[in-house]
Design a protein with these regions (language model features):
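Regulatory and interdomain segments flanking nucleotide-handling catalytic cores
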Residues: 3, 131-132, 136, 218, ...
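Acidic/His-rich, divalent-metal-binding segments that scaffold phosphate/diphosphate chemistry
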Residues: 17-154, 168
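Alpha-helix N-cap and coil->helix boundary residues
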Residues: 115-116, 133, 173, 221, ...
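An active-site-proximal "capping" alpha-helix that borders the catalytic cofactor pocket
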Residues: 97-106, 152-165, 222-235
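Histidine/acidic-rich helix-loop-helix segments that form or flank divalent-metal centers
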Residues: 122-124, 164-203, 217-218, 229-235, ...
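Low-complexity, glycine/alanine/valine/leucine- and proline-rich hydrophobic stretches
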Residues: 264-308
Length: 328
């Protein structure tokens, strides 16, 4: 994980999980495993039986959490890239991304307790349990939601929390965060009830992830532009939770597609102390043709500085995510 940003990032409390392996013993999860994990999340959220729900969700959370601890930038690269390009299993892809980012922001920047970090991640993973199938359908629907679809959207927070309780979730903080994750309530985090702090962070990351995601009939925003949508609150003021997301992920989050000053385009793969200078794997040359092989660029150097975000579609078929991740 990158060093804390001076003046912005607080030191998160360390967890006493002695069972965790050392950094050298924890391998980066292959992209294929992430796709399997998203399928597991999908299957869990559409299941009609409560048997094993909490244990299975805990296991999924633990696997994601371990990757975020030891391979944060690779995990962000994978999840943000998939979130910006993958329409299959839309709801599960979205929930995994939101949960991972919420936990990282909560621990690294907001310095929340370990229990709050776990609760916000699990709440985000399970927040759409009452509309997983509907959300997948809407991602491929070019028309606006029907009256019945909108009714289900409006009710899914409350019904989802109730269903989670039926499925064995006992953590009131988790349940209340799900129940209120669509609340539009601006204001500082310190003035909120604990559940409201979690719900606000989920809501901000939810907005970010949704706006960069592909949908039928709507072009996704580049991650940098999607990020700016969570920075201001409903009154047009700087939102504390939204700003924490930006402080954590940087101006150009891992997984973003960017254009460099030398004309190349590629994928951001690592944050740095400077929000303006992430590590980038160049994929497309200035001539618009794929480079012979993915090439790591240090955008802190003038000749490789980031000019702007660009659409992932501009990379064509040049982005082999597994090859890109091997360069981190």
């Amino acid at each position: 994980m990158i060093p804390p940003k001076p003046g912005k990032t607080k030191q998160a409390p360390r967890r006493s999980k002695t069972a965790l392996a050392s950094i050298s013993e924890v391998s980066r999860m292959p992209v294929a495993r992430w796709l399997q994990l998203q399928q597991s999340v999908h299957d869990l959220l559409i299941a009609e039986e409560a048997d094993g729900f909490v244990a299975n969700l805990d296991a999924i959370h633990a696997e994601i959490d371990l990757q975020m601890r030891h391979h944060a930038d690779a995990t962000l690269t994978t999840l943000i890239y998939l979130g910006a390009t993958e329409i299959n299993l839309y709801s599960a892809t979205h929930s995994v991304l939101v949960g991972a980012v919420c936990a990282l922001v909560a621990g690294q920047t907001l310095a929340w307790s370990a229990s709050d970090c776990d609760a916000v991640a699990k709440a985000a993973l399970s927040m759409n349990i009452e509309m997983t199938a509907l959300q997948d359908h809407l991602a491929r629907q070019s028309l606006r939601p029907s009256a019945e679809q909108q009714r289900l959207i409006d009710l899914h927070c409350v019904l989802g929390a109730d269903l989670l309780a039926e499925f064995g979730v006992k953590d009131k903080l988790w349940l209340d965060a799900v129940r209120h994750h669509h609340d539009k309530t601006p204001g500082p985090l310190a003035a909120r009830e604990p559940f409201s702090r979690l719900a606000r962070l989920i809501e901000r990351v939810d907005v970010y992830a949704a706006r960069m995601a592909p949908r039928e009939g709507r072009s996704p925003l580049p991650p940098e532009m999607a990020m700016s949508s969570c920075r201001l609150d409903e009154n047009g003021q700087i939102d504390e939770a939204g700003q924490a997301v930006i402080d954590t992920l940087g101006k150009y989050p891992p997984g973003s597609a960017v254009r460099l000053s030398n004309g190349e385009s590629g994928i951001v793969v690592s944050r740095s102390v400077s929000a303006e200078a992430p590590k980038v794997v160049a994929l497309i040359g200035a001539d618009g043709k794929a480079l012979p092989s993915p090439t790591l660029r240090d955008t802190g150097l003038k000749q490789f500085r980031v000019l702007q975000s660009t659409a992932h579609g501009s990379l064509g078929g040049a982005a082999n995510l597994e090859k890109i991740l091997r360069l981190i």
